[in-house]
Regions:
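The feature captures the beta-strand-to-loop junction immediately N-terminal to the Walker
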Residues: 30-32
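ABC ATPase NBD coupling module
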Residues: 61-76, 81, 105-109, 125, ...
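Conserved catalytic motifs of ABC-family nucleotide-binding domains
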Residues: 149
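Catalytic Walker B motif of ABC-type/P-loop ATPase nucleotide-binding domains
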Residues: 153-157
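Conserved ABC ATPase signature
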Residues: 128-132, 136
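Conserved ABC ATPase "signature" region
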Residues: 95, 106-124, 171-175, 223
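Helix-to-loop junction immediately C-terminal to a conserved catalytic motif
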Residues: 45
Length: 235
């Protein structure tokens, strides 16, 4: 993102925000409520249109592309809300995602088994979506997001509504995705969990990036502690 701006009525909620996510890098976009982080995130996703600035994937601008076209060029979005089909099994949920990306025949079955094994969901492959725990659902959702072999994944509140053990599992999955060369952008209200996995973080307030750096740099920033983390924050 380069110099992105967004105004709703008379209020400028995002004011000249720039940040980048590289291949094989996990980046966090954080900040207090009303900071503009969610609007900035949604402009990358394609849910909100910027008033000014540009959004690029590599050297190509994707600012004018709708969500489905962004997915085709390698940008996968995982929303906070449940995105699996509750009345389909885990196996069927993944198959639907593969078919949506035009994968069929033997290749579809082979990719299905690869994803089931990679995300350790073989024991629940015949379980219905409505019967999954929060952590299991997240695993299946990420498996579905990988159906199209994306270059980048956008994770909206990936740690919301799951227990501590599941948080550690999701963090490990994110590390594996990073090791595969996939770039990942995370926005989440669970600050400690997010800073525990990202390589770099941007902290927003009043529509602008106020602090940026590694997890350690952000966690020890006096400015970030003053307006967001609190004086007693520890990683």
């Amino acid at each position: 993102m380069q110099g992105i701006c967004k105004q709703f009525k008379s209020r400028k909620v995002v004011d000249g925000v720039s940040f980048e996510v590289r291949s094989g890098q996990v980046v966090g976009l954080l900040g207090p409520n009303g900071a503009g982080k969610t609007t900035s995130f949604y402009m990358v996703v394609g849910l909100v249109s910027p008033d000014d600035g540009d959004i690029k994937l590599g050297d190509s601008s994707i600012r004018s592309l709708p969500m489905f076209q962004r997915a085709r060029v390698g940008l996968s979005y995982l929303p906070q809300e449940a995105s699996i089909f509750r009345r389909l099994t885990v196996r069927e949920n993944i198959l639907v995602a593969l078919e949506a990306h035009g994968i069929s025949g033997t290749a579809k079955q082979e990719r299905l088994e690869e994803l089931i094994e990679e995300f350790s969901v073989g024991h629940i492959r015949d379980s219905y979506g409505y019967a999954l725990s929060g952590g299991e659902r997240r695993r299946v959702e990420i498996a579905r997001a990988l159906a199209g072999d994306p270059k980048f994944i956008l994770l909206d509140e990936p740690f919301a509504g799951i227990d501590p053990i599941a948080v550690a599992d999701i963090q490990e999955i994110i590390r594996k995705l990073r090791d595969r060369g996939i770039g990942i952008l995370i926005t989440d209200h669970n600050v400690r969990e997010t800073l525990g996995i990202v390589d770099y973080a941007y902290i927003m307030k009043d529509g602008k990036v106020q602090v940026q750096g590694s997890s350690h740099e952000v966690a020890t920033s006096e400015l970030a502690r003053r307006f967001y983390l609190g004086e007693n924050f520890r990683l």
